[in-house]
């Protein structure tokens, strides 16, 4: 009714609901908020198949949707794990096993890159500062995202 998108935030180990992130357009800017008092550490949103051969971690919901679109285009059996923040991405990636990759945000502050490096996993990001996978998708198309995913998934951990 008020145009809010509600994104469930579930604990990465047992899928218990920890809270909700609300996303809405306010004055032509996207506003993201978590419900007061909720625990964000370990919170994720999984997008894609339940049983996947590969896992791609990212920070934001829109970023995750763009990565999932590219993965489906590539016909990869992979799940996207949206971690909601760079700090939480490090925590969650360290607590999961299997073939894992990171699509980092290319922040001016280098926060996304530092988080990707801290995981020790193969990672990629847009070469344009200030962009995440969703920005890259909007600017250059889904194939630009797919190209980076293909390159990083061929990397040795």
Task: Give a label for each model feature.
Residues 1-55, 66-69, 73-74, 123:
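Basic, glycine-enriched DNA-binding surface that flanks or lies within the catalytic cores of DNA
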Residues 50-56, 61, 65-157:
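TOPRIM fold recognition
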């Amino acid at each position: 009714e008020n145009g809010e998108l509600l994104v469930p935030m579930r604990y990465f180990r047992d899928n218990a609901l920890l809270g909700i992130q609300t996303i809405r357009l306010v004055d032509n800017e996207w506003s993201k908020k978590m419900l007061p008092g909720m625990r964000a550490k370990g919170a994720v949103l999984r997008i894609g198949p339940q049983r996947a051969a590969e896992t791609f971690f990212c920070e934001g919901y829109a970023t995750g949707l763009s990565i999932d679109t590219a993965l489906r285009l590539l016909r990869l059996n992979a799940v996207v794990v949206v971690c909601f923040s760079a700090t939480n991405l490090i925590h969650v990636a360290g607590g999961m096993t299997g073939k894992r990759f990171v699509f980092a945000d290319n922040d001016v502050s280098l926060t996304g890159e530092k988080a990707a490096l801290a995981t020790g996993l193969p990672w990629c990001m847009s070469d344009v500062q200030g962009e995440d996978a969703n920005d890259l998708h909007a600017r250059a198309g889904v194939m630009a995202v797919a190209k980076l995913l293909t390159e990083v998934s061929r990397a040795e951990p």
